[in-house]
Amino acid sequence: MAKRYLLDFEKPLVELEKQIEQIKELARDSEVDVSQQLLQLETLAARRREEIFKSLTPAQKIQVARHPQRPSTLDFVQMFCDDWIELHGDRNGGDDMALIGGIGSINNRPVLMLGHQKGRDTKENVVRNFGMAKPGGYRKALRLMQHANRFALPILTFIDTPGAYAGLKAEEQGQGEAIARNLREMFGLKVPIVATVIGEGGSGGALGIGVADRLLMFEHSVYTVASPEACASILWRDAAKAPEAASALKITGNDLLKLGIIDEVLPEPSGGNNWAPLDAGNTLKEAIEKHLNALLQMPEDQLIEERYKKFRILGKFIEANNIEEIYSEIPQKTE
């Protein structure tokens, strides 16, 4: 098993993890029965881990969402189905490895699954561009979704990106147009779409595959209009203000559920999905099946209409004749 990567707020667990590893090594190298000591330490570590994760700040949740050992799109695909076939290319000369897709089956139901894919190490992240898709990735995703629409396959998307790639070449190739086209076309697809934020849901890069009938989110995932670091740099000219920005942006599942942005928050194992990937996979699979079963009962016209309404009602604005009227509508901070 790969060595566990502990986040900075998990440091109280470091010593316990060392003791657990030492006892496991002792058990491997000798015939001494250490099962009781091992059970006590693992129970203590689990209890402390649960206490830590019950009170995470939004900034700490971002660290969990970005954890290098957090289950990825491919991990969930492998958990869900044995016969997944990856489909490649945007039919315009590109095959973006940061956004992958293919056809598989869940409980004998054929589906299209696509999502952002990060790497586990530096070499993989270079190949996957750290999960930041280029225009070709979104065009590939649209091609696959249109294929699913043609053959009446439900669409499952997995969102895990800091944002769409913002390099000069991507802009020259029409990054904004590619994402905008996906948004427009997804509203008209006649098949159910269930999207899940499995890690980071960053800006337009997430929205490019996020127009869905149901939007799910793991409890330690984040979904945001801009990264807290970028927001802090814009508002305060100081990236160190990222924790404050994270709180103000309302990026957590519970906040977004209250705001009506998402439809369900999925619980994670103690310590996050990286501690028990199979448990996370079972939770997600059950949720997807529940929502798909409900959506498949809807007529196509109703499905499209409700998808449109779901996004049309998001957000609000204040209209007034002058600035004083606007300020009078905003709750004032009390001392």
From Swiss-Prot:
It comes from the Bacteria. Pfam families: ACCA (PF03255). Its main location: cytoplasm. Pathway: Lipid metabolism; malonyl-CoA biosynthesis; malonyl-CoA from acetyl-CoA: step 1/1. Residues 40-294 form the CoA carboxyltransferase C-terminal domain. One of its GO terms (biological process) is fatty acid biosynthetic process. It catalyses: N(6)-carboxybiotinyl-L-lysyl-[protein] + acetyl-CoA = N(6)-biotinyl-L-lysyl-[protein] + malonyl-CoA. PROSITE patterns: COA_CT_CTER. It is an enzyme of class 2 (transferase). GO terms for molecular function: acetyl-CoA carboxylase activity; ATP binding; carboxyl- or carbamoyltransferase activity. It is found in: Cytoplasm. InterPro entries: Acetyl_CoA_COase_a_su (IPR001095), ClpP/crotonase-like_dom_sf (IPR029045), COA_CT_C (IPR011763). One of its GO terms (cellular component) is acetyl-CoA carboxylase complex. Its EC number is 2.1.3.15. Keywords: ATP-binding, Cytoplasm, Fatty acid biosynthesis, Fatty acid metabolism, Lipid biosynthesis, Lipid metabolism, Nucleotide-binding, Transferase. HAMAP family: AcetylCoA_CT_alpha. Component of the acetyl coenzyme A carboxylase (ACC) complex. First, biotin carboxylase catalyzes the carboxylation of biotin on its carrier protein (BCCP) and then the CO(2) group is transferred by the carboxyltransferase to acetyl-CoA to form malonyl-CoA. Acetyl-CoA carboxylase is a heterohexamer composed of biotin carboxyl carrier protein (AccB), biotin carboxylase (AccC) and two subunits each of ACCase subunit alpha (AccA) and ACCase subunit beta (AccD). Belongs to the AccA family. This is Acetyl-coenzyme A carboxylase carboxyl transferase subunit alpha. It comes from Prochlorococcus marinus (strain AS9601). The lineage of its organism: Bacteria, Bacillati, Cyanobacteriota, Cyanophyceae, Synechococcales. The gene is accA.
